[in-house]
Design a protein with these regions (language model features):
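Conserved SAM/SAH cofactor-binding pocket of Class I
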Residues: 117, 121-203
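Conserved beta-strand signature within the Rossmann-like core of class I S-adenosyl-L-methionine
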Residues: 233-241
Length: 274
C-alpha cells in the first residue's frame, strides 16, 4: 500500500500575527505536496513527495518555537477515507464547492473538486474568501489568471461566473494533474488553459483579474511579478495571510488601491485595483 510522508504540526495558541505566514514560507522551501490545515488553524498535516523533503522540513521547524511537529507515514487509504468522511459540499456566496460524493441538486452553481494534493477544496477560509471576493467582480468578457491554482477551484469559479478566457498556473506537477482532472470533471477542459511555470519566469498576456491564494511571504516576495500580470484598471485578489498583515500586503502593491477586504478567523483576503 502506498504511503505519504507527512508532518503533523501542532500550533500553540494563540497564534502570533505572522506565525502562519512564517510557517507557510518555511514549508514552501521544502516543496510540500499538500498542506491540510484544520479549520481552527491549530493542527496542520503537511504531505511531501519524498521522506527526505519531509525530514528536512521537520529539522527546519525547530526554528519556530510556537510549533511542535512529528513525522508520520499516512497510508493512501487513510487519506481517501478521511476526505470522504470529513469533506462535504461547502457554500460560498452563489457557488457551491462539492466533492464527487456530495453533489447537491439544483440551485447554486456547483464546482466539483476531487480532493488530492492540490490545495483548494473550499473548506479552507482562504479559498472561500477568494471565492466571495471574485463574485463581487463582473467577469463577463474578462481574462482571468489563477496563479498557484492548486486544485483548480478558483479557475473553475471564474469560468462558472462568466470569464471568457481563464488560465490556471502552478509550478507543482502533482497539483496541475489534480487541477486538470477537476477541470475536465466540470466540463471546462476546452475553456481553461493550464500552464506549469513559476512566478519569476512566467511570461503571459496580462489579465483583467489575477488571483493569487498563496502566502503573505510569497505575495510580498513576488509583488512586482503579480502587479505586472494585471492590466490597467484590472483587479488582483490575494489571500493566504492573517488580518493583521493586510496593511503589509497592501503596501507591497503601492500602485494599486484596496477596494475590498474579507476576513474569516485567522485569515484575510484583499481585492486591489490597478
Amino acid at each position: 500500500m502506498a504511503e505519504y510522508p507527512a508532518l503533523d504540526i501542532e500550533i500553540a495558541p494563540p497564534a502570533g500575527d505572522s506565525l502562519y505566514d512564517r510557517l507557510y514560507a518555511l514549508l514552501d522551501d521544502y516543496q510540500p505536496a499538500a498542506i491540510d490545515p484544520a479549520e481552527d488553524g491549530g493542527h496542520w498535516r503537511v504531505f511531501f513527495r519524498t521522506a527526505n523533503q519531509r525530514d528536512a522540513a521537520f529539522a527546519a521547524l525547530a526554528a519556530i518555537r510556537e510549533v511542535r511537529a512529528s513525522a508520520v507515514e499516512v497510508p493512501d487509504e487513510d487519506w481517501a477515507r478521511r476526505t470522504q468522511e470529513d469533506l462535504r459540499a461547502v457554500e460560498a456566496g452563489r457557488l457551491i464547492v462539492a466533492p464527487p460524493w456530495d453533489i447537491p441538486r439544483g440551485g447554486k452553481a456547483v464546482i466539483v473538486i476531487e480532493p488530492s494534493t492540490g490545495f483548494g477544496t473550499g473548506h479552507h477560509a482562504t479559498t472561500r474568501l477568494c471565492l466571495l471576493l471574485l463574485q463581487q467582480l463582473d467577469l463577463r468578457r474578462a481574462r482571468v489568471l489563477d496563479v498557484g491554482t492548486g486544485s483548480g477551484v478558483l479557475a473553475l469559479a471564474a469560468w462558472k461566473l462568466g470569464a471568457h478566457d481563464v488560465v490556471a498556473v502552478d509550478n507543482d506537477p502533482d497539483a496541475l494533474a489534480n487541477a486538470r482532472e477537476n477541470i475536465a470533471r466540470n466540463g471546462a477542459a476546452a475553456a481553461i488553459d493550464i500552464i506549469r511555470d513559476d512566478l519569476d519566469t512566467l511570461r503571459i498576456q496580462r489579465a483583467e483579474v489575477v488571483m493569487a491564494n498563496l502566502t503573505g511571504a510569497v505575495l510580498v516576495r513576488y509583488a512586482e511579478e503579480l502587479h505586472s500580470l494585471v492590466v490597467k484598471g484590472g483587479y488582483l485578489i490575494v489571500s493566504g495571510f492573517a488580518p493583521d498583515d493586510m496593511a503589509v500586503i497592501a503596501r507591497a502593491f503601492p500602485a494599486m488601491k484596496v477596494i475590498a477586504e474579507k476576513r474569516e478567523g485567522d485569515w484575510a483576503a484583499l481585492t486591489l485595483r490597478l
